[in-house]
Amino acid sequence: MARHVWQAGRFEIGLDKPKIMGIVNLTPDSFSDGGVYSQNAQTALAHAEQLLKEGADILDIGGESTRSGADYVSPEEEWARVEPVLAEVAGWGVPISLDTRRTVIMEKALALGGIDIINDVAALNDEGAVELLARQADTGICLMHMQGLPKTMQINPKYQDVVGEVARYLKARSAECIAAGIAPQRIILDPGFGSGFGKPLQHNIALMRHLPELMAETGFPLLIGVSRKSTIGELTGEANAAERVHGSVAAALASVARGAQIVRVHDVKATADALKVWEALGINL
C-alpha cells in the first residue's frame, strides 16, 4: 500500500514525507501541560501560532481530555472551549483538525467552516457520526482504536493479540465508513498508543514494533500519537509528562522509520529538527 495523499478538507496533504500534527489542548486537566493553554482563547491561539512557526503542518484542537481516568465533560462545555479557537484558526490557511468523539461537536464545527479533519478517538462510533461525515465531500478523518472509555479504559485491558485486534477493529471501522460513502483517500488510521487508550506498556511496544504489518493489514496510512504519554514515562522513568520530550522524539522517529506518515506531537520544534537530521542522513532505524 502506497498512498501519497490524504484528502483533508481544503487540502490535499502529501504523505511522501512525514508530517507533523501539533497539539493544541484546550482542557484544564490535560495530562501533558496541566491545562496551561486552556486559560483563554488568546493563550491557545498564541500557542497554535508558535507551533506553526516551529514546523507544524497541521493543528489539532481538542476540548475533552482523553487521559486515563478523565472526568466527564458535557458537550456544551466542550464546545465552549473549542469554538472561539476554531473560529479564529479557520482563517489561517493551514489544515485544521478537530479532536472530538461527539457527533454534535463535529456538526457544529463543520457548520462553522474551516475545519479540515475530524480526529476521533472513538473511530466515529458516536450515533450519527459516520452519516454526518459521509455527507461531507472532502473532510479528512482519523479513526483511532480505543478500548473502553476515557474514564475506565485502563482498568484491566485485555488482548489476546493486540496487533491483530487493533488491525481488525480499524479495518472494520474504515469499511463501515467506505460503505456509507466516505472515500478511502479521506481516511487515515491511529492505533491508539498509551495507557489512556486501554493499552499497557507491553502492548504499546508490540504495536510500535509491528507498524509495518499494521499498515499492510489495514491498507491505510498511519497517524501516530505517543508524545509525552505514560509509555514514554515508563520507558524513561520520567514521571513529569512535560519532561518526556527526548523520549517522545525518539518514538516519533521510530514511528516514521517504520512507515508512519503523520506524527501527532506536543514538542513540534524538537520533532521537526530531529526529522530534518534523520532525513538528511538517510537513517533507516
Swiss-Prot record:
Result after altering T231M: In strain: BT490 / Serogroup B / Serotype 15, 952 / Serogroup B / Serotype NT and 3976 / Serogroup B / Serotype NT
Residues engaged in binding Mg(2+): N25
Presence of keyword Metal-binding: yes
Effect of mutating P84S: In strain: 3976 / Serogroup B / Serotype NT
Consequence of changing S68P: In strain: BT490 / Serogroup B / Serotype 15, 952 / Serogroup B / Serotype NT and 3976 / Serogroup B / Serotype NT
Annotated phenotype, changing V36A: In strain: BT490 / Serogroup B / Serotype 15, 952 / Serogroup B / Serotype NT and 3976 / Serogroup B / Serotype NT
UniProt entry tagged with the keyword Magnesium: yes
A family per Pfam: Pterin_bind
Reaction catalysis annotation: (7,8-dihydropterin-6-yl)methyl diphosphate + 4-aminobenzoate = 7,8-dihydropteroate + diphosphate
Cofactor(s) listed in the protein's UniProt record: Mg(2+)
Enzyme Commission no: 2.5.1.15
Keywords: Folate biosynthesis, Magnesium, Metal-binding, Transferase
Chain positions recorded as (7,8-dihydropterin-6-yl)methyl diphosphate binding sites: T66, D99, N119, D190, K229, R264, V265, H266
Resulting phenotype, A206T: In strain: 3976 / Serogroup B / Serotype NT
Effect of I96V: In strain: BT490 / Serogroup B / Serotype 15, 952 / Serogroup B / Serotype NT and 3976 / Serogroup B / Serotype NT
Associated pathway: Cofactor biosynthesis; tetrahydrofolate biosynthesis; 7,8-dihydrofolate from 2-amino-4-hydroxy-6-hydroxymethyl-7,8-dihydropteridine diphosphate and 4-aminobenzoate: step 1/2
Impact upon substituting V277A: In strain: 3976 / Serogroup B / Serotype NT
Xref: PROSITE patterns: DHPS_1 (PS00792), PTERIN_BINDING (PS50972)
Biological process annotations from GO: folic acid biosynthetic process; tetrahydrofolate biosynthetic process
Result of altering A239S: In strain: BT490 / Serogroup B / Serotype 15
Domain (Pterin-binding) ranges: 18-276
Effect on the protein of changing G196C: In strain: 3976 / Serogroup B / Serotype NT
Cited function: Catalyzes the condensation of para-aminobenzoate (pABA) with 6-hydroxymethyl-7,8-dihydropterin diphosphate (DHPt-PP) to form 7,8-dihydropteroate (H2Pte), the immediate precursor of folate derivatives.
Subunit structure: Homodimer.
Protein name according to UniProt: Dihydropteroate synthase
Organism, as annotated: Neisseria meningitidis serogroup B (strain ATCC BAA-335 / MC58)
